[in-house]
């Protein structure tokens, strides 16, 4: 497969306008490790001004809407990410005495929609107890940023709380309390900020392999890790209003390896279930796939930025994928993805967690619907 072509568009006075002279694009979505706190997606674009930055583009400023598109087929481009400009910095190149012209570079930093919530004062809003769906509607009304909790068919409840910090802090604690993931790189029909239930695991349409056939995607780098943050023998889950639940693995001695979580769980029973789930998940050290990396150019059929046929990179956190390595297939869940593109090459890195660290029973699912293969989720 040949090089992929990407374009970065900014919102101008009469619609989106493509940037020119792009030197590189770097994009990061999701997290790298399962227990890492959710964070806004980010992107960085470097462009060159061969005639100098004397007349900068007026719209290149904080808050301007941007999109990154794959336009390899110009007649049918598709968005892989959306967000806003957070910063623009310019490095001015001094011309040489021999007559070489100015070499000015602008670095445009961008961020997903969750970042807006991180700067938005909660104003001590009294969030009523209720389903997460209803709480997200209230949060949307108060913040002005559309958001939703995407379930896997279950109904989750959230405790009453006062949003005394930022709306981003409330969303992050809600996600943590429910072991959920974040998607914030597109204005989807469900909202700009989506918290994804751990039961909402969407399978990729394609798989990864070191010896691919058909449309499977080929990777050339694979990493296995035994992360310290994936091993604890004591878990303590604190709630705002119902006390703390602490559970301990059997047969262990002090000093304990303790994972402490501050949640807004709706009851002590919910905290108990969460604590036991986390302990059962992480009480045994494991060596597992943590990431794989692949280039666009090595694919027979390129699908790396659209492995769910109707969605793109912004949709990846929470999707399941099979990775085949030396004849063994490992079911995994995507935690995050990064893309690094230059005119010479485009590389994607996928950060994953093993299916055994996502212990949920999802009926009729090829991986998570097998009894005796997974512990029940809380």
Describe each PLM feature range:
Residues 34-40, 105-114, 245-256, 286-288:
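Short, compositionally biased low-complexity segments
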Residues 1-19, 172, 176, 181-333, ...:
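Acidic, small/polar-enriched beta strand-loop surface segments
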Residues 2-5, 39-42, 48-148, 347, ...:
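Surface-exposed cap/loop segments at beta↔alpha junctions
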Residues 24-66, 114-117, 128-130, 301-314, ...:
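Extracellular/virion structural assembly segments
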Residues 26-28, 46, 84, 109, ...:
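Generic structural detector for well-ordered beta-strands
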Residues 25-35, 86-100, 184, 335-341:
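Short amphipathic beta-strand and strand-loop transition segments with alternating hydrophobic
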């Amino acid at each position: 497969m040949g090089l992929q072509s990407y374009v970065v568009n900014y919102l101008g006075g009469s619609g989106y306008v493509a940037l020119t002279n792009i030197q590189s694009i770097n994009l990061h979505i999701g997290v790298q490790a399962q227990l890492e706190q959710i964070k806004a997606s980010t992107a960085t674009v470097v462009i060159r001004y061969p005639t100098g930055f004397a007349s900068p583009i007026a719209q290149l400023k904080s808050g301007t809407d941007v999109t990154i598109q794959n336009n390899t087929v110009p007649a049918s481009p598709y968005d892989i990410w959306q967000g806003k400009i957070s910063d623009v910095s310019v490095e001015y190149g001094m011309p040489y005495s021999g007559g070489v012209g100015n070499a000015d570079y602008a670095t445009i930093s961008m961020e997903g929609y969750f970042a807006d919530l991180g700067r938005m004062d909660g104003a001590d809003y009294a969030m009523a107890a209720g389903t997460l769906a209803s709480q997200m509607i209230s949060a949307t009304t108060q913040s002005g940023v559309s958001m939703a909790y995407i379930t896997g068919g279950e109904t989750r409840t959230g405790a009453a709380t006062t949003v005394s910090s930022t709306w981003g802090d409330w969303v992050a604690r809600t996600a943590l309390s429910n072991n959920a993931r974040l998607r914030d790189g597109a204005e989807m029909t469900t909202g700009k900020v989506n918290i994804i239930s751990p039961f909402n695991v969407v399978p990729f349409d394609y798989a990864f392999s070191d010896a691919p056939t058909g449309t499977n995607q080929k990777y050339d780098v694979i990493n296995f890790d035994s992360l310290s943050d994936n091993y604890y023998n004591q878990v303590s889950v604190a709630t705002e209003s119902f006390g703390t639940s602490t559970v301990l693995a059997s047969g262990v001695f002090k000093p304990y390896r303790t994972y402490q979580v501050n949640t807004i769980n709706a009851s002590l029973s919910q905290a108990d279930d969460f604590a036991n789930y986390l302990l059962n998940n992480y009480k045994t050290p494991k060596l597992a796939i943590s990431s794989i990396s692949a280039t666009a150019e090595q694919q027979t059929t390129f699908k790396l930025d659209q492995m769910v046929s109707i969605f793109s990179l912004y949709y990846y956190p929470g999707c399941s994928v099979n990775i085949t390595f030396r004849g063994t297939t490992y079911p995994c869940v995507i935690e995050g993805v990064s893309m690094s593109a230059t005119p010479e090459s485009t590389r994607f890195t996928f950060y994953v967690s093993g299916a055994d660290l996502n212990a949920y029973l999802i009926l009729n699912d090829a991986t998570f619907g097998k009894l005796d293969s997974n512990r029940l989720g809380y």
